[in-house]
Amino acid sequence: MLVLAIETSCDETAAALVRDGRSILSSVVSSQVKDHAVYGGVVPEIASRKHLETIPAVIGEALRLADVTLDHVEGVAVTQGPGLAGALLVGLSVAKSIAFARRLPLVGVNHIEAHLAAIFLEREVAYPYLALVVSGGHSHLYRVDGIGRCTTLGQTLDDAAGEAFDKVAKLLGLPYPGGIEIDRLASAGDPDAIAFPRPLLHDGSFNFSFSGLKTAVLSAVKKQGLPEGKSLADFCASFQKAVCHVLVEKTFRAAEAAGIDRVVVAGGVACNSALRREMAHAAAARGVELMIPSPSLCGDNAAMIAVPGDYYLRCGEQGGLALDARVNWPLDLLGSGREG
């Protein structure tokens, strides 16, 4: 089955043509980073307007690169949530229009479930596996027993990891997106220069909390002033190590508790070089199989939407014109929240 997938949950406008939920014929992502950089973060209204301006060209380019037309498409999959309401509605409206005009089946996809399934675009993974999704809005641990069969084991109680990276970067006066800049600066720093706290590391749960770490950073800046040069690199490296330490330890503790020896890490923060490195070291030490998608599949993209989309379309599921944006759409065991 050839699926046209569309993703507009936040500030990336993306479209992809994927065959059988595995083979990427094309994947186009248009970033809005420059549009939001001046504000230091994503502005929902601007994101929606940019999606409206960009999505026709993005879909057209995806079709061109795949060397197909809409006549070849057999189904449409679109991000239904979670995400920004206005942004989601742009993608949904376009997907509905195409599906209606072409009489194609249409299915809504959970953005987070798509992150969990992105690894299948590069390799097959046996179920069950333990998955960590780390992004600007999520730091969640899941047991994955199949598409539509996800159980939440732990989640962020306040700031997600990606949000913490961006907020700390803003405190330090770094450009947006802050997570990338912290990773870059940290490569030249000493990760043991500052002993930042590890929130909830020993609380016995698999939940995360990064607001306290953010407060510790703010206190350090107020006490010492804004770091510069080598001190800034050390500061970034120490903060990054604290975040990665908690993510790594809780992930593998959860895997051990669940009796699972396969771990998948996904989401935009999975692009972070230190996290990828520390996850690899921890997996090797524990004899656990670690799988992290290529960076292009960790950030928001439409190709990953096609993986669960293809599955649900084959199961005969159709959302039709009734599909609406689901700003909050938690995964759970019952159909990955599709009925929740």
Curated annotation (Swiss-Prot):
GO molecular function: iron ion binding; N(6)-L-threonylcarbamoyladenine synthase activity
Predominant localisation class: cytoplasm
Keyword Transferase: yes
Organism for this UniProt entry: Geobacter sulfurreducens (strain ATCC 51573 / DSM 12127 / PCA)
GO BP terms, alphabetized: tRNA threonylcarbamoyladenosine modification
Native organism taxonomy: Bacteria, Pseudomonadati, Thermodesulfobacteriota, Desulfuromonadia, Geobacterales
Protein's recorded name: tRNA N6-adenosine threonylcarbamoyltransferase
EC number(s) given by UniProt: 2.3.1.234
Pfam families: TsaD
